[in-house]
């Protein structure tokens, strides 16, 4: 079983991430993790913060000479902007005179609609939003992307699983229903696209949508799809709600900031169909039993089917709107304009990379639940034994 935790604030010295339960022998380096973090920063519509804040990766435990040791993996993602925030975000007390007149230390008393600001202040007893927004920020996803890269390498090396994502909708622009989906070898092409869309014509329309939205001082949401190739049948279980693979994946994806909906395969479209047109019929092909389609998205009864896993996540428009939404100044009780931090027009392309990481972590957990192993070699052996012993093929 895998367990993972992250710690740190948006403008703190670093984010720290710990992954426990990974077998020994997974090949992974700082460069692998740095490359994953660079993918998270890309995408048309990102804000100025992506240009000057850098992710400094340090592996501080669990890996030696490029291979996991079997103990907890600890990764630090440093914040190059920390010197500017050192006094404001200091863990230790700072004399009041040193903070006097520091603009960054001004109380944030105008909570932003759509953020954790207001309810977080109420829940934790703060009279300003800084202590809430620092942890609620999507900056925290950098730590999850770092851990997700380690999980991705395990899945690739132990199971032969490959994960790819792409943007399928941005604002009012969507890829056609019959558009091809990217294969693992297409990931570089997807990443090279400004909005990480696999369809060039749709990509151009998405870029125009971002430009129009920027001109009006607004923000844009969208939908990303994650596809996992090479999964064996039987990850997850039907026996309890919390062991169902789709439930675990949905929870992980809903835990990403600004994600408001998740669907598998044809998802909500199946609700409008008759049952005879909603399911995947079964027959026998040259390689054994197979499904004629993949409307279920690679999951049936809470278990992977062996077909490609297809899951989509809907991201709401970023809540920090440049033209500022109406709110209340909690220090005066009077109407006010919401505090505006630097923000993106859209972060949908980056959301796909974060979604990949969460899918990788859940799938790695499910794989270890099924096959176990204190080393990658042991996991591979157990997987082969399982596949060789399948009664129904």
UniProtKB/Swiss-Prot annotation:
Cofactor(s) needed by this chain: FMNH2
EC number: 4.2.3.5
Reactions it catalyzes: 5-O-(1-carboxyvinyl)-3-phosphoshikimate = chorismate + phosphate
Residues binding NADP(+): 40, 46
UniProt GO BP: amino acid biosynthetic process; aromatic amino acid family biosynthetic process; chorismate biosynthetic process
Record GO cellular component, one term: cytosol
InterPro entries: Chorismate_synth, Chorismate_synth_AroC_sf, Chorismate_synthase_CS
Residues binding FMN: 135-137, 257-258, 301, 316-320, 342
UniProt entry keywords in alphabetical sequence: Amino-acid biosynthesis, Aromatic amino acid biosynthesis, FAD, Flavoprotein, FMN, Lyase, NADP
Comment on bound cofactor: Reduced FMN (FMNH(2)).
GO molecular function: chorismate synthase activity; FMN binding
This protein's pathway: Metabolic intermediate biosynthesis; chorismate biosynthesis; chorismate from D-erythrose 4-phosphate and phosphoenolpyruvate: step 7/7
Superkingdom in the source lineage: Bacteria
Signal peptide per UniProt: none
Region (Disordered): 280-306
Enzyme class: lyase
Subunit structure: Homotetramer.
Cited function: This reaction introduces a second double bond into the aromatic ring system.
Family classification: Belongs to the chorismate synthase family.
Protein name, per record: Chorismate synthase
């Amino acid at each position: 079983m895998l367990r993972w935790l992250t710690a740190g604030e948006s403008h703190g010295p670093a984010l720290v991430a710990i992954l426990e339960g990974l077998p020994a022998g997974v090949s992974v380096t700082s460069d692998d993790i740095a490359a994953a973090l660079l993918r998270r920063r890309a995408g048309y519509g990102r804000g100025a913060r992506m240009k000057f804040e850098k992710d400094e990766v340090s592996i501080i435990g669990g890996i030696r000479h490029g291979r996991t040791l079997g103990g907890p993996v600890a990764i630090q993602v440093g914040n190059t902007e920390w010197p500017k925030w050192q006094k404001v975000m200091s863990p230790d007390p700072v004399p009041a005179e040193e903070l006097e007149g520091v603009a960054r230390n001004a109380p944030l008393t105008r909570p932003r609609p759509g953020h954790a600001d207001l309810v977080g202040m109420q829940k934790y007893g703060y009279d300003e939003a800084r202590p809430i927004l620092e942890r609620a920020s999507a900056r925290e996803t950098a730590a999850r992307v770092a851990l997700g890269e380690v999980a991705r390498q395990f899945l690739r090396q132990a199971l032969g699983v490959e994960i790819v994502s792409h943007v399928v909708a941005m604002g009012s622009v969507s890829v056609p229903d019959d558009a091809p989906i990217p294969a693992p070898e297409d990931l570089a092409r997807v990443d090279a696209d400004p909005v990480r869309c696999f369809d060039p014509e749709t990509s151009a329309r998405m870029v125009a949508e971002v430009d129009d939205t920027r001109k009006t001082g607004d923000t844009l949401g969208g939908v990303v799809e994650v596809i996992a190739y090479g999964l064996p049948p039987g990850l997850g279980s039907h026996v309890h709600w919390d062991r169902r693979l789709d439930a675990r994946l949905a929870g992980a994806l809903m835990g990403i900031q600004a994600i408001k909906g998740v669907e598998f395969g044809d998802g909500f479209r199946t609700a409008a169909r008759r049952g005879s047109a909603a399911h995947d019929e079964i027959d026998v092909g040259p390689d054994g039993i197979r499904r004629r389609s993949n409307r279920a998205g690679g999951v049936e009864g809470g278990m992977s089917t062996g077909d490609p896993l297809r899951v989509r996540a809907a991201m709401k428009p970023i809540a920090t709107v440049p033209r500022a939404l109406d709110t209340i100044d909690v220090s005066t009780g009077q109407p006010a304009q919401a505090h505006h931090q630097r923000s993106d027009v859209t972060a949908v392309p980056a959301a796909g990379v974060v979604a990949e990481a969460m899918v990788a972590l859940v799938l790695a957990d499910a794989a270890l639940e099924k096959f176990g192993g204190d080393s990658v070699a042991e996991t591979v052996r157990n997987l082969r034994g399982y596949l060789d012993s399948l009664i129904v093929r």
